[in-house]
Amino acid sequence: MPVEALYWKDGRLYVLDQTRLPEETVYVTCSSYRDAAEAIKTMRVRGAPAIGAVGAFGLVLGALETGGDRESFLARLREIAGVLRDTRPTAVNLDWALERMLARAVETLGEPGALRAALLAEAQAIVREDIEANRRMGLFGRELIPDPARILTHCNAGALATAGYGTALGVIRAAREAGKQVKVFAGETRPFLQGARLTAWELMREGIEVVLVADNMAGYLMAREGLDLVIVGADRVAANGDVANKIGTYSLAVLARAHGIPFYVAVPLSTVDLRTAIGRDIPIEERDPAELTHFRGRRVAPQGVAVWNPAFDVTPNELITALITDAGVLKPPFGEALRRAVGSGRRE
């Protein structure tokens, strides 16, 4: 069974600590919005939809800590949302979820007690809707999967990265549930090893055939093994269809184009940012140099070496075969298709 990345119980948020996988399955307790912010910042939880859900519940935790009259309560909520929003800048779901939560608070009549109840209901709706969206993506996307299929994926876009079921891995799950034979090649995804630690673990739990490969093997893998497709998730999609995803995605898209292999991005509409016109306008998070210079606490690079460690890159829309969304499969040109899909299929 797919694992839960997060759940709410008795006024607390429980987050699966993904930094400890695959060795340990441990949930950390978030009792305050600061705990939720720390879980996001330290990548105990990661993946754009999952980050959005944790941010939403983080605002609920903040509301439970906040008193005063209605106006002071709303002002404090905005401050807490700012703290949560600043944890990771690239994944747009976090900002989207927080804006949705704040809008729900403003439109709810009554004093703080009523607002707290409304916020909890909204956070639970965000989780429920994400799972439903992922399952719809799976149904749309599985039609693109041949039988049998040899698939390369990158990072982790499964149940661990979402409220449940997954985006890219959700499509693979749906194909498997439809009786198709799939073999997945999981890129290790340096430097945080989400592919090695998380994707391989998820797929093995469900009995889906998976082969772990080093990131720098991708070109040779495509030339040697005759892949049927590459499928990844996304942390933000610009209005023109450019996609920000885990560092290394752009390289895979270039290689896929060179080898004539379809390159698909599975993404819920909550990850589409129509306010960002093109990919180069997407803010790219840069992380701690120690993620490259150290491995499990041990230095593996010379002391004092310069490090550049962007967590994401941007894949131009012209390298993308299709966007698999919860509103259907979108083909290029993506601009108008995204505007129509968001306008008809997403709650703002």
From Swiss-Prot:
<dbReference type="InterPro" id="IPR011559">
    <property type="entry name" value="Initiation_fac_2B_a/b/d"/>
</dbReference>
<dbReference type="GO" id="GO:0046523">
    <property type="term" value="F:S-methyl-5-thioribose-1-phosphate isomerase activity"/>
</dbReference>
<keyword id="KW-0028">Amino-acid biosynthesis</keyword>
<dbReference type="Pfam" id="PF01008">
    <property type="entry name" value="IF-2B"/>
</dbReference>
<keyword id="KW-0486">Methionine biosynthesis</keyword>
<comment type="similarity">
    <text>Belongs to the eIF-2B alpha/beta/delta subunits family. MtnA subfamily.</text>
</comment>
<comment type="function">
    <text>Catalyzes the interconversion of methylthioribose-1-phosphate (MTR-1-P) into methylthioribulose-1-phosphate (MTRu-1-P).</text>
</comment>
<dbReference type="InterPro" id="IPR037171">
    <property type="entry name" value="NagB/RpiA_transferase-like"/>
</dbReference>
<dbReference type="InterPro" id="IPR027363">
    <property type="entry name" value="M1Pi_N"/>
</dbReference>
<dbReference type="InterPro" id="IPR000649">
    <property type="entry name" value="IF-2B-related"/>
</dbReference>
<dbReference type="GO" id="GO:0019509">
    <property type="term" value="P:L-methionine salvage from methylthioadenosine"/>
</dbReference>
<protein>
    <recommendedName>
        <fullName>Methylthioribose-1-phosphate isomerase</fullName>
        <ecNumber>5.3.1.23</ecNumber>
    </recommendedName>
</protein>
<comment type="pathway">
    <text>Amino-acid biosynthesis; L-methionine biosynthesis via salvage pathway; L-methionine from S-methyl-5-thio-alpha-D-ribose 1-phosphate: step 1/6.</text>
</comment>
<feature type="site" description="Transition state stabilizer">
    <location>
        <position position="155"/>
    </location>
</feature>
<feature type="binding site">
    <location>
        <begin position="46"/>
        <end position="48"/>
    </location>
    <ligand>
        <name>substrate</name>
    </ligand>
</feature>
<keyword id="KW-0413">Isomerase</keyword>
<feature type="binding site">
    <location>
        <position position="88"/>
    </location>
    <ligand>
        <name>substrate</name>
    </ligand>
</feature>
<feature type="binding site">
    <location>
        <position position="194"/>
    </location>
    <ligand>
        <name>substrate</name>
    </ligand>
</feature>
<dbReference type="InterPro" id="IPR005251">
    <property type="entry name" value="IF-M1Pi"/>
</dbReference>
<feature type="active site" description="Proton donor">
    <location>
        <position position="235"/>
    </location>
</feature>
<dbReference type="InterPro" id="IPR042529">
    <property type="entry name" value="IF_2B-like_C"/>
</dbReference>
<feature type="binding site">
    <location>
        <begin position="245"/>
        <end position="246"/>
    </location>
    <ligand>
        <name>substrate</name>
    </ligand>
</feature>
